[in-house]
A protein has these predicted regions:
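Aromatic-rich, lipid-facing transmembrane alpha helices and their immediate juxtamembrane interface loops
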Residues: 1-226
Length: 226
């Protein structure tokens, strides 16, 4: 199943997004949210390993035009890897603040896209694309295994407090990818259509949600997640 997700954005987008990421990291330090900060940084590095090391160097499916691939993909990975992982972790750890953190990230993604489209004409344009046929099936394997682990845990447990919050995990797994895919499509940064939005939303970030929840549950006493 070959899809070609693509983006075309300018340097102003990158500049503004770097400021946002620094401010968000500073907020986490100020409020002593050190674990989400660490999870975000590790998530960004994991994304970079997959994108630059896997898609660009190993598979050759990632194309970058208008920027140095290493530095551009480092920013791209830290941007989405950091926000995606932070958002999911806080969804599990702070259910009372789900709306606030969700709005913060979604509104930022939309705002920076519109601002850079309107005010970034003087900045260089970077275009990227990525073929998915060579690895989406691998993602599907991890997607199934992750959710199968949670499902069988629920089928085997007799204690309500030990059940995995499947609906909540699925909700954030779908929401994260769908939110930024939709923003990219609506604002014209991504020209790929609805099929790419749906498949990527079902597949990509969602495959990591079960594993991240298992890590969260192992490291902390989970709050009741609805």
């Amino acid at each position: 199943m070959e899809l070609m997700p693509n983006r075309s954005l300018n340097g102003l987008y990158m500049f503004l997004d770097c400021i946002f990421l620094v401010l968000l990291a500073f907020y986490f330090v100020k409020t002593k949210r050190y674990v989400p900060l660490l999870v975000g940084v590790l998530g960004g590095l994991l994304y970079f390993l997959a994108d630059y090391g896997g898609f660009y160097l190993l598979l050759g499916t990632r194309k970058v035009v208008g920027a140095n691939p290493f530095w551009f993909l480092l920013w791209l990975s830290m941007s989405y890897g950091f926000t995606n992982m932070v958002w999911m972790w806080l969804w599990f750890a702070e259910p009372e603040n789900r709306l606030e953190f969700s709005l913060l990230i979604i509104v930022w993604w939309f705002s920076v896209a519109v601002i850079s489209n309107g005010a970034g004409a003087a900045f260089p344009v970077i275009s990227i694309e990525r073929g998915t046929g060579g690895y989406h099936w691998i993602m599907a394997v991890f997607l199934f295994i992750g959710y199968a682990i949670l499902i069988f845990k629920n089928l085997q447990t007799k204690q309500p407090t030990e059940r995995m919050p499947l609906l909540s995990i699925l909700a954030i797994g779908l929401l994260v990818q769908f939110a930024w895919e939709a923003v990219l499509l609506i604002t014209g940064i991504r020209s790929a259509g609805i099929r790419t939005l749906i498949v990527d939303s079902l597949m990509e970030t969602n495959l990591g949600a079960p594993y991240l929840y298992l890590i969260y549950a192992a490291l902390s006493k989970p709050k009741e997640v609805a």
